[in-house]
Amino acid sequence: MMQICDTYNQKHSLFNAMNRFIGAVNNMDQTVMVPSLLRDVPLADPGLDNDVGVEVGGSGGCLEERTPPVPDSGSANGSFFAPSRDMYSHYVLLKSIRNDIEWGVLHQPPPPAGSEEGSAWKSKDILVDLGHLEGADAGEEDLEQQFHYHLRGLHTVLSKLTRKANILTNRYKQEIGFGNWGH
């Protein structure tokens, strides 16, 4: 009885969510033999064009909190997974997030102020700026509540990114004509 309960809890652990995401991205990486074929190919699958917005730093290693630019008519709320992005952009983002999980997030210097990227995205070191969590009046209950809130959010984002990696892999297989391979 105890083993069944432990197995259920392990299935929903953060470690397993990270492993599922890393496994999906590894599968995507092994399937996509020629990533350049993904350039300029729109990802028409609506399952990939929704609500996860993350920005990769200019050097490809740092996740940044962002102040989104004004969305144009072709974007879905200005998110990274907007329809205007091609499959290659999705591929690079998913691999970058996998590397951040496996190797850690390195703080990258912000892009130059005059650059296009610098005007659209406001860099902020989200790992170091924890001052708002360390308020003098914050009790232990608040920390526990914040921890559980962020843990649920991280688990949700990892699940969505895993699904997105699987969708991209299947879409690539359709594009090059071997949609039934590996099933």
Curated annotation (Swiss-Prot):
Modified residues (Phosphoserine): S75, S79
UniProt family annotation: Belongs to the SPOT14 family.
General function of this protein: Plays a role in the regulation of lipogenesis in liver. Up-regulates ACACA enzyme activity. Required for efficient lipid biosynthesis, including triacylglycerol, diacylglycerol and phospholipid. Involved in stabilization of microtubules.
Cellular component GO terms, alphabetical: cytosol; microtubule; microtubule cytoskeleton; nucleus
GO molecular function: enzyme activator activity; identical protein binding; ligase regulator activity
One GO process term, biological-process aspect: regulation of lipid biosynthetic process
Modified residues (N-acetylmethionine): M1
Compartment annotation: Nucleus; Cytoplasm; Cytoplasm, Cytoskeleton
Source lineage: Eukaryota, Metazoa, Chordata, Craniata, Vertebrata
Residues annotated as signal peptide: none
The keyword Nucleus appears for this protein: yes
Protein name stated in the entry: Mid1-interacting protein 1
Main location: nucleus
InterPro entries: Lipogen_MT_Stabilize_sf (IPR053719), Spot_14 (IPR009786)
Organism this protein belongs to: Homo sapiens (Human)
Assembly mode: Homodimer in the absence of THRSP. Heterodimer with THRSP. The homodimer interacts with ACACA and ACACB. Promotes polymerization of Acetyl-CoA carboxylase to form complexes that contain MID1IP1 and ACACA and/or ACACB. Interaction with THRSP interferes with ACACA binding.
The keyword Nucleus appears for this protein: yes
Entry keywords, A to Z: Acetylation, Cytoplasm, Cytoskeleton, Lipid biosynthesis, Lipid metabolism, Microtubule, Nucleus, Phosphoprotein
